[in-house]
């Protein structure tokens, strides 16, 4: 199955980038961190080495880094949800105050 790639104009690329910036919840608190781990964190194969077994220090380190990245991502998403709930309740209060 072949994938069809469409060339995008610079304007379309800019619009996609702006949309991405608006959709991604950028956290500023201590729970926010790197959303994606560095390349190779999930890989059990080290560059230039044979396959790392599941009990090797390399695989344990990779799993620990992946677990840490997942924990940070979850904390960041929970903080974003909490901010959204607070903003929704605040906007609802403002709507009730402005009601005639």
UniProtKB/Swiss-Prot annotation:
Keyword Endoplasmic reticulum annotated: no
Q: Which UniProt keywords apply?
A: Cleavage on pair of basic residues, Neuropeptide, Secreted, Signal
Propeptide segments, given as residue ranges? 31-59
Q: Which tissues does it occur in?
A: Expressed in testis and, less abundantly, in liver and kidney. Expressed in seminiferous tubuli and several brain regions, including nucleus ruber, caudal paralemniscal nucleus, nucleus centralis pontis, and nucleus subparafascicularis thalami. Expressed in neurons of cerebral cortex and subcortical areas. Expressed in Purkinje cells of cerebellum.
Tell me yes or no: is DNA repair among this UniProt entry's keywords.
no
**Biological processes per GO annotation:** cAMP biosynthetic process; neuropeptide signaling pathway
This protein's GO cellular component annotations are: extracellular region
Q: Which domain of life is it from?
A: Eukaryota
One molecular function GO term is: signaling receptor binding
Pfam family name, one: TIP39
**Annotated compartments:** Secreted
N-terminal signal peptide? 1-30
Q: What else is known?
A: The N-terminal truncation of tuberoinfundibular peptide of 39 residues [TIP39(7-39)] reverses PTH2R/PTHR1 binding selectivity, then is a highly potent and selective antagonist for PTHR1.
Q: How does it assemble?
A: Ligand of high affinity for the PTH2 receptor (PTH2R).
Q: Which family does it belong to?
A: Belongs to the parathyroid hormone family.
Q: What is the role of the protein in this entry?
A: Plays a role as a potent and selective agonist of PTH2R resulting in adenyl cyclase activation and intracellular calcium levels elevation. Induces protein kinase C beta activation, recruitment of beta-arrestin and PTH2R internalization. May inhibit cell proliferation via its action of PTH2R activation. Neuropeptide which may also have a role in spermatogenesis. May activate nociceptors and nociceptive circuits.
Return the protein name: Tuberoinfundibular peptide of 39 residues
């Amino acid at each position: 199955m072949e994938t069809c790639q469409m060339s995008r104009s610079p304007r379309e690329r800019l619009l996609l980038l702006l949309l991405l910036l608006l959709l991604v919840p950028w956290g500023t608190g201590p729970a926010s961190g790197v959303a994606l781990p560095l390349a190779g964190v999930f890989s059990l194969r080290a560059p230039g080495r044979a396959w790392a077994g599941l009990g090797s220090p390399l695989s344990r380190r990779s799993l620990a880094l992946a677990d840490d990245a997942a924990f940070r991502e979850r904390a960041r998403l929970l903080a974003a949800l909490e901010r959204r709930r607070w903003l929704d309740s605040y906007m609802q209060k403002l709507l009730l105050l402005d009601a005639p």
